[in-house]
Each structure stands twice: as structure tokens, then as C-alpha cells.
Amino acid sequence: MAWCLKEYPSLKFDCDGIAFHYYGGTIEQTTFIKNEYPNLQLHFTEGGPRRYDNYDTDWCKWTLMMIKALNNGYSSFTGWNLMLDEAGGPNVGPFFCGGLVTRNYHSGELSYSGQYKAFKHFKGITSSSQIHPLHFMRGELKMHAFDRKGKLYTEGCLVENTSGNTEIVLVNPSTEKEQIQYYYCDKWWYIEMLPNTAATIVFES
């Protein structure tokens, strides 16, 4: 995409946004486009669960991706298949896709993907919401001379809604519990994130 914008300078005036599919790379790799072309919106599209890949327990994966998208200036996050059956059908592509929701073909029973559970943490966000990345005080990082390679930490974003309420959406993708502190409204808040959890904390106005 970057080369297209450089090769065709008028392109930035002919479109108002860029959509990225969930096939390769990372969300952070697209941030420079937002920095260089602030008038262009970024959209995450066509990202959905797979039936064989922790279908109903990968809420941390999706919550983390949504948080990263919001923190990197994305305007929207769109899934893929709304509802499929237990075999991933009807399947018109080469991948064994899962739906946001699965409906059992024989019993009609519904089951819900980890992505579905992740989306629930962002249901209050609108186009008017203000998003801010979160930064935490971590005593552990001050006590060690170096960070442990590959260690996962709790990440999150702060959402200011037009209703006046403020929310923080958090995800701890680690296998270890993490205790964090967050300073908000002249007060320190203690938050304990259990392993493999997502949480939303609401500060009511």
C-alpha cells in the first residue's frame, strides 16, 4: 500500500481510507501510514476465527488485536463470517473458517467464538469515542536489569464515550497473573488480571 501512495500521489485524495486484511504482518507495521497520511482512515477487515484453532477460547488473541488496532489509530475492526455451521460451511474458500457464531446444522444450538466474546468488550465504542493507549506502572520492570524475552504483559486502551463514561479495556494474554496500577481521576487503581483474561472496567460519570 505504501508504494501505491508514493507512486500515485493523487491517490490520497481519491480515497478516504485503507483496509487491511488478516493474512500476514502485524497491525504495528501499518502505523507509519497513519503517521504519514493522517487524513486517511485505517480499517481492519476480513478477520475471523478458524474452527480448528482454539475457536471458542481465543478471546485474548482477538481482544489484543482490537486493542492494538484502536491504539494505532484504526477507525474500524470488521470480522468475517457472521454465522457458519459446525463444519465451517457453507465454505466457498480454501480456509476452514469459523463463524462469529456457530449454529449446529442438526440441533440448531448456538455456540460462540472467542472473537464474539472479545467484541463484547468494545460494544460501547462509537465513531465519536476518543481512544487513548494505556501505560501501566510495573514494579517488576524496575527491579530487573533486563526484560525477560518473550514475556507477555497486560495491554489495554482507554475509551472516552460521549455518554460521559470512561472505560478501560484490558487483556492479559500471559499464562501468569499480573498485578498492575493505573492512575485515573487523582487516584491510583489496583487491577489484578488473571491469566488468559480480558476485562472491561467502567468509570461512570
Each language-model region and where it sits:
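Substrate-binding and catalytic surfaces of secreted/luminal carbohydrate-active proteins
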Residues: 1-205
